[in-house]
Swiss-Prot record:
Subunit structure: F-type ATPases have 2 components, CF(1) - the catalytic core - and CF(0) - the membrane proton channel. In yeast, the dimeric form of ATP synthase consists of 17 polypeptides: alpha, beta, gamma, delta, epsilon, 4 (B), 5 (OSCP), 6 (A), 8, 9 (C), d, E (Tim11), f, g, h, i/j and k.
Additional free-text comment from the UniProt record: Present with 14600 molecules/cell in log phase SD medium.
Similarity field: Belongs to the ATPase F chain family.
Protein name: ATP synthase subunit f, mitochondrial
Pfam families linked to this entry: F1F0-ATPsyn_F
Keyword terms: ATP synthesis, CF(0), Hydrogen ion transport, Ion transport, Membrane, Mitochondrion, Mitochondrion inner membrane, Transit peptide, Transport
Compartments where found: Mitochondrion; Mitochondrion inner membrane
GO biological process: proton motive force-driven ATP synthesis; proton transmembrane transport
Domain of life: Eukaryota
Function description: Mitochondrial membrane ATP synthase (F(1)F(0) ATP synthase or Complex V) produces ATP from ADP in the presence of a proton gradient across the membrane which is generated by electron transport complexes of the respiratory chain. F-type ATPases consist of two structural domains, F(1) - containing the extramembraneous catalytic core and F(0) - containing the membrane proton channel, linked together by a central stalk and a peripheral stalk. During catalysis, ATP synthesis in the catalytic domain of F(1) is coupled via a rotary mechanism of the central stalk subunits to proton translocation.
Transit peptide boundaries: 1-6
């Protein structure tokens, strides 16, 4: 109930039709309000095209009907590659000739 009331305040009411504007002192101000609300875009907002690498990845694997489990595989493979590179740097590079073992 409260949510419905909060959302209803975001949508402006029809203030007045331009036909009913008379010679009242604030008629010009109401005409400006009517013109402002008529000039607002109507309908859904156009989709924003992803332009960064992370935004394209998110659009490809997370948004809409494209949601999948591939990012989990990417994360796991990244951890494995990172772990192996650290293991190589800190340990395996010292044993290239295998004379120590």
């Amino acid at each position: 109930m409260i949510f419905k009331r909060a959302v209803s305040t975001l949508i402006p009411p029809k203030v007045v039709s331009s036909k009913n504007i008379g010679s009242a002192p604030n008629a010009k101000r109401i005409a400006n309000v009517v013109h402002f609300y008529k000039s607002l875009p109507q309908g859904p907002a156009p989709a924003i095209k992803a332009n960064t690498r992370l935004a394209r990845y998110k659009a490809k694997y997370f948004d809409g009907d494209n949601a999948s489990g591939k990012p989990l595989w990417h994360f796991a493979l990244g951890i494995i590659a990172f772990g192996y590179s650290m293991e190589y740097y800190f340990h395996l590079r010292h044993h290239k000739g295998a004379e120590e073992h």
